[in-house]
Amino acid sequence: VDRRTFLQLSALGAGGLLLPSTRLIAAEQLLVPADTARNRRLADAALAAAKAAGASYCDVRVGRYLRQFVVTREAKVENVVNGESIGVGVRVIADGAWGFAATNTLTSDGVANAARQAIAIARANARMADRRVELAPVTPAGTVSWRTPIKRNAMEVPVAEKVALLLDVNAAAMNAGADFAASRLFAINEQKYFASSDGSWIDQDIHRLWLPFTVTAVDKASGKFRTRDGLGAPVGMGYEYLDGDAAQKHHLPGGLIAYGMSYDAREDAVAAAKQARAKLSAPSVKPGKYDLVIDPSNLFLTIHESVGHPLELDRVLGYEANYAGTSFATVDKRDAGFRWGSPLVNFVADKTRAGSLGAVGYDDEGVKTKQWDLVRDGILVDYQCTRDQAHILGKTESDGCSYADAWSSVQFQRMPNVSLAAGKQPLDVAKMVAGVEKGLYIHGRGSYSIDQQRYNAQFGGQLIYEIEHGKVTRLVEDGAYQIRTPEFWNSVSAICDESDFRLGGSFFDGKGQPSQVSAVSHGSATTRFDGVNVINTARSLG
């Protein structure tokens, strides 16, 4: 990847597109199918070499990672990049310790050498280890395959069609009053072949898609400007997500529109331009206590930061302390029946939900994915773990949470989809709002900060509206809600029903050293929180 491309990707926060040994290719090469027969030969060669060298366990990941991104601004195409990265990662246990090595030499000798290198690393690690690796058992999968259920492969869509869509989005925003408009499209295809000495040969074809945009309105007299980002979620779907199906739209109080499993980016861009312009003259929020009605387009990030991350077992145990901190949610709290939220609060971990970013058939340890409870009726009941962590919790199986972002990266525990279950009683957003006397209605991801134990945080929003006497009234600016994680989730007094359930997500979630990125969804229905402190972010002490 050249310097210009690197800088553009970094500025977009899309470092996850910059995989090792990425080569730039023509768009047509994105359509070359995976060579499953070759992958099987390479995997078997690595397994045989590891066994011959004394490994008690070995797994092999043959990965082909395809990335395409298109970047536009107003009527210009700024960049189109197609990238491919192919290689093999070999992980072993020898003398009770882990070892890992990787290669992009796609020959039997090349992968056998990587296996032997992994053995040497494991034996070196064993000399310093104070305990042996304990792997939870896994049911061998045999020879299986899994595909993201897509209707239209984004890689098959001509670049010209993608460019036309993005330029239409920009034009729609500009025609509706925006001064600037920038849109991007990210399409990712992970072709992953996993084999292990347990007896699994798993071929997976995984697709993800995201169309983010930002529109800007400027007050030329004062120089003041305001932005509004797109409200479309990143998804584990094909290009069909961008068809704008009217049946997937949610018409909400205040004339707002939200999107389910289909996204009309042009329509959203028109609304964004008008709302960015309205934000220029919106009054600043009055700080104080409010009842909050939070849309899934905002709440997903709060779930991600205050529930998903603190319940990663490696973070709980302190293994992530150098990078984004630890967790207040220590294992003794689970054992004591710690109250995480009100009895309405149920958090579900899931690696199977169709359309979600985290959906796969098997994780990167060959564990079949599933759904399980993290918080049940407000009580902390479980965490997220991998095969070598399960025994710490007294569990007999992994949760299927292992992931590596590239063939050259070692797999480790990553967050599954974590969602707040919808309410069990019929309730729509209009009725929820009607019951609020003094509140705020919050949409879209804003700026945020959270402490090193995932306990104290604050979150802003793209759009914040006042609620007075059961009605959505005016748009306000400069608001952010403050939380202490348990207090915040214990303030939940109502959750809309399943008909309002929607996914948000993080397309580039960072973790680990060296850093890796993963993609993860978080779903919820619109949720009410009572008596939450809201600050004015524009105020200064002076």
Where are the language model's segments positioned?
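N-terminal small-residue-enriched
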Residues: 2-542
